[in-house]
């Protein structure tokens, strides 16, 4: 059937392992006033903002005054940082070496099996604000920001679970 054509084995490409980059947190400002103003302007409840700042999950960076959303591992060691500009320019990104297994999250005070997923930290904080406004205890919910859009495959069985969700479900 193939005549004089030679037959070659298919080439197999292996996915290159990415070299781990050292995680670097943005420089922290002496206060978080601009970050607070920005988040309040976005409709986030001030008590929720202050709680996140006091628990070390949000701060304002220097010299650009970005809001920094942090993710920690089980030992409360920082592993992830996402920053967002507080001015009118749409500026955002992840800190060098961030581990997506530990994105920004607010975990329940109790043993809740329910988890709410959000594209971004701002979406997560907006939902917490809505819960509070409706009279619910926002601290009784596991809320995880995916820090980016997640698209499933046509066949759900072929979809990969985002690493931050996989990491949460292992607990």
Named regions from a protein language model:
Residues 7-101, 109:
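Basic, glycine-enriched DNA-binding surface that flanks or lies within the catalytic cores of DNA
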């Amino acid at each position: 059937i193939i005549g004089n054509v030679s037959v070659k084995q298919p080439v197999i490409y292996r996915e290159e392992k990415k070299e781990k980059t050292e995680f670097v947190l943005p420089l922290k400002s002496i206060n978080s006033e601009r970050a607070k103003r920005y988040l309040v302007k976005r409709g986030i409840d001030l008590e929720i903002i202050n709680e996140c700042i006091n628990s070390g999950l949000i701060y304002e960076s220097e010299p650009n005054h970005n809001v920094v959303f942090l993710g920690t591992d089980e030992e409360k060691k920082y592993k992830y940082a996402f920053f967002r500009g507080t001015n009118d320019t749409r500026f955002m990104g992840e800190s060098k070496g961030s581990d997506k297994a530990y994105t920004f999250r607010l975990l329940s005070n109790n043993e809740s099996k329910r988890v709410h997923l959000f594209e971004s930290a701002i979406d997560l904080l907006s939902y917490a604000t809505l819960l509070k406004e409706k009279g619910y205890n926002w601290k009784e919910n596991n809320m995880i920001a995916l820090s980016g859009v997640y698209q499933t495959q046509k066949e759900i069985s072929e979809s990969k679970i985002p690493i931050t969700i996989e990491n949460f479900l292992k607990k």
